[in-house]
Amino acid sequence: DRAKTALGGIADAIAWPATLLSSAGFIDDPWALVKLRGKIAGEELAQSLLDGQHGHRPVTFVAYSAGAYVVQSCLQKLYEAGDRGKNIVDRAIFISAPISTSKDVWQPMREVVSGRLVNVHCHTDWILLLMWRFNMLDPMTRLAGLSIVKRVPSVENYNIKNLRHAHLPDEISRVLEEIDLQE
């Protein structure tokens, strides 16, 4: 009987983490798909903005959670377009964004957003933290939705306490009011 041997105790100790790791696969694949689709959607959005389909009005983006992939990808494509990509986006607000805080990510966005570039974070957003830990290969990368963007000084950082990731759609008005963007 396995339970009566020393190996049984070891097997039982390994079985629980192994079960967790194998069940984490259901999170990983959809998350990678969300990132990929966000990148593609952002590139398409950038192209439509470059084509002038928005008219001659300034654009404001408010992106939360995985929607940040779309906006970040769009802003990156606008940056790659050089001068053509500038003066299209007036403001970009990222709320609980699962993107890196690195200068490589935020500096290009800063260069194409003519007005406010805002990172709204909450260090106690456990849902975002859990999703990040299951899907992030580099544990040294800081996540914008959980911390401040330090290396691009003109990025506004707001720590919104008690931001509930699961209820973000209901929280948007409150967040926009707290960062003085409600119009």
What are these regions (language model features)?
Residues 73-77:
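Active-site signature of alpha/beta-hydrolase-fold catalytic machinery across serine-
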Residues 1-43, 51, 79-91, 97-183:
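Lipolytic serine-hydrolase domain surface
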Residues 66-67, 92-94:
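DG-centered beta-turn motif at the end of beta-strands
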